Amino acid sequence: MPFAQPVLLLAVVSAISVLSAQPRALVENIDVAPALEVPSPENVDGPIIQLALLLDTSNSMDGLINQARTRLWSIVNEMSAIAVAGEVPQLQVALYQYGNSGISAAEDHVQLRCRFTTDLDIVSEQLFALSTKGGNEYCGAVLREALTELSWVGTGRKHVLRLVVIAGNEPFNQGTEPFGEWTSHAMKRDIRINTIFCGPEQEGRRTLWEQGALSGNGYYAFINQDYQEPEIETPFDDALKQLNDALNGTYIGYGRRGAESLKRQEMQDQFNASASVSGFFSRVLSKSSSNYATGSWDLVSGVEDGSIALEDIDSKSLPEEYRGLSWSSA
C-alpha cells in the first residue's frame, strides 16, 4: 500500500467504526440544502486522506445519523494524529445519503450532500441536516455515484489514502446495480471500500456486508446503532467551553465566505454541544488541529498558511471594524 502500512488503514477504519455510542440527546434536523458546491481542496504536495461517507437515511437509521454527527470530530482527531513522512495528511471528506424515499426513485434514492472538502464545518452542517424517511437501500447505486461523481486523486500520486465507508442495515445486494462491479472498479483505482453493518455480526455477513468489504479490499465492522453511552460531566467542562469561545474570537472572516463561515462555525458549535458533551469537546480539540482548515475564509489562518498576502487583500472584503487599518510585518 503506497500510503502506509495496513495497520494504519485499520486504525482509520476503527476510528470511523466508533459509531457505536448514541448521543444522549437528539438534535432536530435543520433545513439545509446539499452543499454540492464547496471550496475545492487546495492542491498540496503532501499526503492526503480522502474519505467518502455513505450513510443509510431510511427510517431505521436515526441512531446511525446522530452517531455520525458527533463522531465526525473523533475521526478528525484520529487523522490529525497520523504522520506520513513527517507530515500530517490533508483530510478531505465527502458525504452521501442513500435509502431515503424523499429522494427520487429515478436517482436510486441516492443524494450527494457534500463533495470532497477540507471545510469540516460544511460536513457537520450537512450531517445535522439529514433526516430519515423509509426507502430502498441500494448499496451498489450509492457506490457507483461515489466512485464516479467525486474527484478522487489519481493513482499516480504517492501518499494518498482513498477510503469509502458505507453504513446501513439492509442486504448489501439490494437493487439492480451489482455491488461487485463497483468494488472491483474501486480496487483498480486503489479506493478501499469499508462497510459498517448496523446489526449483529453474523447478520451482516449473511447479507453480504462483509463480502462488500472483502471484495473492496477494505474492512468489515458491525455496530449496535442504538447503544447508549453515558455522558459524564467533568470539572473541566466549563473551562473548555470558555476556551472554545476565546478561540472563536481569533477568527477574522474575510471575502465572500467570511461572514457565512463564521455563522456556520457558531451554529455547528451549538448543534454539537446540544447533541453530545463528548462530541462537542472532540470538536473543540479538532479546531486546534491542522485538519480544521479555515484558510479559505479566515484571515489569520490564510496568512499563517501562506494562501493570503495581506498586501493583496481588498479592504472591502474585511469586516467593517478592520477596514482602513494599516498592517506591519514586524
Feature locations, PLM:
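C-terminal "exit" segments of structured domains
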Residues: L214-G216, Y220-E311
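VWA/integrin I-like adhesion module and closely mimicked acidic/polar interface patches used
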Residues: E170-S215
